[in-house]
A protein has these predicted regions:
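Bacterial signal peptide processing site
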Residues: 29-31
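Active-site recognition of the HExxH zinc-binding catalytic motif
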Residues: 396-412, 431-435
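C-terminal motif of bacterial Sec signal peptides marking the signal peptidase cleavage site
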Residues: 25-27
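Active-site-proximal, well-structured secondary-structure segments within enzyme catalytic domains
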Residues: 178-187, 191, 218-388, 455-467, ...
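Short pre-active-site segment immediately N-terminal to the catalytic Zn-binding motif
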Residues: 385-401
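Post-HExxH zinc-binding segment in Zn-dependent metallohydrolases
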Residues: 254-264, 424-458
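N-terminal helix-rich structural modules
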Residues: 36-165, 171-218, 236, 530, ...
């Protein structure tokens, strides 16, 4: 089973794949696939390759339902019992994969039709986790994955210095008064402007992850053992093999895309640093140094929209109080989800199945621990689709549910395809779809949805709206790139366990221009404070999604016949845009992503030019604002 999680919004996506704990890219050095040295005695194939692929689809159909169900139960009701069920299910799924991968080797030199060849590629390349040869290592790998996710999901920071996980550390931690989970700590990061309060929340959450630093190092060993058993140098080589291009070419492509957007990011970082320095003082935010990581409104400094009030170009002009409107209108989780559903229905797509409303978890239960990380699920690869999200009436959750339903509608669009084709064209596509929809949440759309009364259109309002969007979209780009850059080097062995933390902060400073707010050491494990590390979820997909969503948005706006600046376009209520979107979704993973991109938007290459077009007004404004300043770090 795959998990796809979007960065800022804590968005997880569970769909068909081959593993519960997920990974995606890695290391340096030689990355071409090599002929594997195997311990399995390979006999001549007993069935044709077409029969083998048909059998693989059937086995995955059964295994996916069983495994997804076990993971759903665990993430929506975290106990020792459900953790055991989850781990055992993961182990069975890994063994199913191991069996299929072993048989797939028999057909390496077999000629195939294009359709069969694509299914075979989907089965054998780009796998996010490959099972080791030894059964005991498969069991250990599955158990470690469950353990790390469980620690993260149930973790609490207690002021008395205990982790609070078992609630037995003190009288205060027994009643929960002195302990805060990630949701509570994230609220502090989002809303407080007190330097010391923010520092306490940041250091508190980052004190959790050292618990599984050693487990993570062992997990890497086992994951690499599995990758080597199937002919890859390390797991990262497997990850990079899944993009319908040579692995080295993929790395080059990611770097090319970053080069396109890097100047805009650096301009944004310079302006934000200057405004934070005005608020906190130059002693706390020097104008020629990286920004302290706890001051950007987010636990990971990955998206900065929560500090908008400190950097707003023209205070109060054209402000959109989505949170205030949701609270005033008493919109609950179902009502908010209905608004998002209506967006897709307006494009000509189907209503959500009734089972969605019966089986989804849209609010946080009061009686148990759950993984609140918002996630979209397809349980049976047919019509049993669900959302797991702890929805509250605020802007972030409102945007998140639009994004999550993008995943759900992707599931529904390709649910008639064989299992090996039930996926995004590549993993960035799945994340991009939800965010493409979010780009259409314009002031005009919000007015049609009844959440604002009037739309203010002038240059100052435009710059404000673009700044708010850039704090989310542009601020994210280097973070989206660097997580797997770190992980690639961990998999390849270039980064040793004893250097995990030092190398993490080197990359964060290099790309983001941020720094740890307090002294860090190798007793810390700051990379592990991010869910996607704990749960081994790939991350480069989110960087790619941020590029693709603007490409998709431009193409859909063209289909809708929109005339005007790209940032003003909403495809809401456009059946023509809906048709093009459906074409993009329905292909699933049945063909190379380049073919899907060509059919949908007329190009075979990912490109960031649409981002630059979208943010052209802000880019010019930032250039003016930064004149005479020392930018960089």
């Amino acid at each position: 089973m795959k998990q796809f999680l979007f960065a800022k919004k804590s968005i997880a996506l569970r769909i068909l794949g081959f593993i519960t704990p997920v990974l995606l890219l890695s290391g340096c050095g030689k990355e071409e696939e090599v002929v594997p040295e195997t311990h399995i005695v390979v006999e001549a194939p007993k069935v044709s390759v077409d029969e083998f692929i048909d059998d693989a689809n059937k086995k995955l159909d059964v295994a996916t339902l069983e495994n997804n169900t076990a993971q759903w139960v665990y993430e929506s009701f975290i106990t020792d019992d459900t953790a055991l069920i989850s781990a055992q299910s993961s182990e069975r799924f890994l063994n199913t994969q191991k069996e299929l991968q072993a048989h797939a080797r028999d057909y390496q030199q077999t000629s195939m039709s294009p359709v069969t060849a694509k299914a075979y590629t989907n089965l054998t390349k780009g796998r996010e986790l490959l099972p080791p040869d030894k059964p005991e290592e498969i069991s250990e790998l599955a158990a470690l994955g469950t353990k790390m996710s469980g620690i993260y999901g149930a973790a609490k920071y207690c002021k008395d210095g205990k982790d609070g996980k078992d609630g037995k550390d003190s009288k205060e931690s027994k009643d929960g008064k002195n302990c805060r989970d990630l949701t509570a700590l994230s609220d502090v990061m989002a809303n407080s402007r007190n330097y010391d309060e923010l520092l306490d929340a940041w250091t508190g959450w980052h004190s959790i992850s050292p618990q599984y630093r050693n487990d993570y190092a062992r997990y890497i060993e086992l994951a690499n053992a599995g990758a080597r058993a199937y002919g890859f140098n390390d797991l990262g080589a497997s990850w990079r093999s899944g993009y319908d291009m040579r692995a080295p070419d993929f790395e080059t492509e990611v770097e090319r895309l970053w080069t396109q957007v890097e100047p805009l990011y650096k301009s944004l970082q310079c302006k934000v640093r200057g405004d934070l320095s005005k608020h906190y003082g130059v002693d706390k935010v020097p104008l020629d140094k990286p920004i302290p990581a706890h001051l950007l409104g987010d636990m990971w400094s990955q998206q900065w929209s929560n500090v908008y009030s400190l950097v707003e170009p023209y205070p109060g002009v054209g402000s959109l109080d989505i949170t205030g409107a949701l609270v005033k209108q008493k919109k609950d989780a179902i009502a908010i989800t209905k608004i998002a559903e209506n967006f897709f229905v307006s494009l000509g797509l189907q209503k959500l199945p009734e089972s969605f409303w019966q089986k989804s978890m849209l609010t946080k239960p009061r009686d148990r621990d759950v993984v609140c990380h918002a996630s979209a699920w397809t349980m049976d690869a047919r019509n049993d689709v669900r959302i797991k999200q702890c929805i509250q009436p605020n802007e972030e959750e409102f945007l998140t549910i639009h994004h999550e339903l993008g995943h759900v509608y992707y599931f529904l669009a390709y649910n008639k395809l064989p299992m090996l084709f039930q996926n995004g064209a590549h993993d960035g596509f799945h994340e991009a779809i939800g965010d493409t929809i979010m780009l259409s949440i314009t002031p005009e759309y919000l007015k049609k949805a009844g959440l604002i009364d009037k739309v203010v259109t002038n240059d100052q309002a435009t710059i404000n709206q673009q700044m708010r969007m850039a704090l989310e979209k542009i601020a994210f780009l280097p973070f989206g790139k660097l997580i797997d850059q770190w992980r690639w080097k961990v998999y390849s062995g270039e980064i040793k366990p004893e250097d995990y933390n030092k190398s993490w902060w080197q990359l964060r400073t290099q790309y983001q221009g941020i720094a740890a707010p307090v002294v860090r050491s190798e007793n810390d494990f700051d990379a592990g404070a991010k869910y996607h590390i704990a749960a081994n979820v790939p991350y480069t997909r989110y960087f790619l999604a941020h590029i693709l969503q603007f490409q998709f948005h431009k193409a859909l706006c063209d289909a809708a016949g929109f005339k005007g600046p790209l940032y003003q376009c909403s495809i809401y209520d456009s059946k023509a845009a809906g048709e093009k979107l459906q074409t993009l979704l329905a292909a699933g993973a049945s063909q190379p992503w380049q073919d899907t991109l060509q059919a949908a938007i007329g190009t075979r290459q990912m490109d960031a030019s649409a981002i630059l077009e979208y943010f052209a007004p802000l880019s010019a404004w930032l250039e003016q604002q930064n004149k005479g300043k020392t930018c960089g770090w």
